[in-house]
Design a protein with these regions (language model features):
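Short beta-strand/loop segments at the ligand-binding rim of alpha/beta enzyme cores
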Residues: 43-48, 96-101, 160, 216-226, ...
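Terminal amphipathic helices with adjacent charged low-complexity linkers/tails
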Residues: 76-90, 127, 131-147, 178, ...
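Catalytic beta/alpha-barrel core
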Residues: 74-77, 103-104, 124-126, 164-165, ...
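Bateman/CBS regulatory modules and CBS-like beta-alpha motifs in cytosolic regions of diverse proteins
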Residues: 30-44, 51-53, 82-120, 127-129, ...
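Active-site-adjacent beta->alpha loops and helix N-cap segments on the catalytic face
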Residues: 30, 79-88, 146-150, 194-214, ...
Length: 490
């Protein structure tokens, strides 16, 4: 008999194969803290990230994710300029003070103002001279009844009795000034009357409406973006950094390669302050390799996604629960966060992933059906769905994700070897409704386990391995479901 012990490296488990064991608890679900690490130096207020997929995350999803306390990762199936523009859109969507507001020169025309307002979803634009000195402001009210697109902006802007405030004005004082003058935008100027920023009443209001929004030190929403491993990786990173991105993900199907680390080192050497996440991996060796190379976080998941066919096409993969367990153990004490990417089907899988050692989870299919996703809306047999596809599908690869699967040199579409499919998911309404259920399930799981915060759940969570009968017992059984729950379907 041929020895084979060294060929079988272990048993692989999925989230369905285990359950968290309840423990003594002195804490209620509403009392737990779910703040966690996204990278070495970036924290997020909920441990949920939206995937860098072209039917999941563009600027609208990234804005909504940050407002709910998480973060969105903009996909890279677009030009460098388009991706950088989406980063800017997120950074300008909400801010304590907009430090780099959209402006127009004195030579601008009405058509320019209309285009900017539509492009950036804003209602007012400061007008400055070539030295940056404030000369006026044009708002949507100034343009509402203006039909001459070629009219100079200086003829319609407000230039007299401008309400301004000095650099350093607090949000509380700014709110008072806005209310006193019954205006919506406060122009911030320096001692030389140069425009230094803009505070809007809408942004002040959002601070109270979304108290756990994930923001940078300037009060802007945080956003991440994906880059690839081809020749434009550094150029793409440069454009994203200039646009204000908080972190980038070197996004490939197999992160444990020499080429990926080469890109990581190039990006790090050019932008030493930029947080760089690397994925995807599934083993302890890969985790240590990337951490030693300077990765600020690693992303775990080879083939667990609902639209991924890597495991059946290539015969390669690692059941997700075991992969997270192994990678987290290898990186314990290193300060490198673990992102569990894929395989999350129910809210209960989130506390399982975290107890296995993940710092946060990345979601694709569970978010693809929300209103904020860029996927196409479909009506099928009287029900509303949204399109959802893997980045390894032929359709996505044609749009630019070939390099993720190391097929960027293949120009003939018929010769691509896809590792994903195209499908649809039920429409789920606005993102905040889904996030509420995800967070609620996580809090409930932490309460059952007596974990006051994410680190405690990671350190003390224990599991029991269950059988197929145990899986069946876990789901509703011996009954016909007559009304759908907001957080459960089979």
């Amino acid at each position: 008999m041929i020895a084979h012990q060294n060929k079988i490296v272990g048993e692989g488990l999925t989230y369905d194969d285990v359950l968290l064991v309840p423990a003594y608890s002195e804490i209620l679900p509403r009392e737990v803290s779910i703040q966690t690490k996204f990278t070495r130096n970036i924290s997020i207020n909920i441990p949920i990230i939206s995937a860098a997929m072209d039917t999941v995350t563009e600027s609208r999803m990234a804005i909504a994710m940050a407002q709910e306390g998480g973060i969105g990762v903009l996909h890279k199936n677009m030009t460098i300029d388009e991706q950088a523009q989406k980063v800017r859109k997120v950074k300008r969507a909400e801010s304590g003070m907009i430090i780099d507001p959209v402006t127009l020169p004195l030579t601008a025309k009405v058509i320019d103002a209309n285009q900017y307002m539509k492009e950036y979803s804003i209602g007012g634009i400061p007008i400055v001279d070539d030295k940056g000195t404030l000369k006026g402001i044009v708002t949507n009210r100034d343009l509402r009844f203006e039909h001459d697109n070629d009219r100079p902006i200086v003829e319609v802007m407000t230039s007299e009795n401008l309400v301004t405030a000095a650099v350093g004005t607090s949000l509380k004082d700014a709110e008072t000034i806005l209310q006193q003058h019954k205006i919506e935008k406060l122009l911030i100027v320096d001692d030389n009357y140069k425009l230094a920023g803009l505070i809007t009443f809408r942004d002040i209001t959002k601070v109270t409406q979304k108290p756990i929004a994930n923001k940078d030190k300037y009060g802007r929403l945080r956003v991440a973006a994906a880059i690839g491993v081809t020749g434009d990786a550094v150029d793409r990173a440069a454009a994203l950094v200039k646009a204000g991105v908080d972190a980038v993900i070197i996004d490939t199907a197999h992160g444990h390669t020499k080429g990926v680390v080469s890109v990581l080192k190039d990006v790090k050497s050019n932008f030493p302050k930029l947080e760089v996440i690397v994925g995807n991996i599934a083993t302890a060796e890969a985790a240590k390799y990337l951490a030693d190379a300077g990765a600020d976080a690693v992303k775990v998941g080879i083939g667990p996604g609902s639209i991924c066919t890597t495991r059946v096409v290539a015969g390669v993969g690692f059941p997700q629960f075991s992969a997270v367990l192994e990678v987290a153990a290898a990186l314990k004490g290193s300060g490198v966060p673990v992102i569990a990417d894929g395989g999350i089907r129910y809210t209960g899988d989130i506390p399982k992933a975290i107890a296995a050692g993940a710092d946060c989870v990345m979601l694709g299919s569970l978010l693809a059906g929300t209103q904020e996703s860029p996927g196409e809306t479909i009506i099928y047999e009287g029900r509303k769905f949204k399109s959802y596809r893997g980045m390894g599908s032929v359709e996505a690869m044609k749009q630019g994700s070939k390099d993720r699967y190391f097929q960027d040199v293949e120009d003939d579409i018929k010769k691509l070897v896809p590792e994903g499919i195209v499908g649809r998911v039920p429409y789920k309404g606005e993102l905040y409704e889904s996030i509420h259920q995800f967070v609620g399930g996580l809090r409930a799981g932490m309460g059952y386990c007596g974990a006051k915060d994410i680190e405690t759940l990671k350190a003390t969570g224990k599991f029991v391995k269950i059988t197929a009968s145990g899986i069946g017992e876990s789901h509703p059984h011996n009954v016909t479901i007559t009304k759908e729950a907001p957080n459960y379907s089979r």
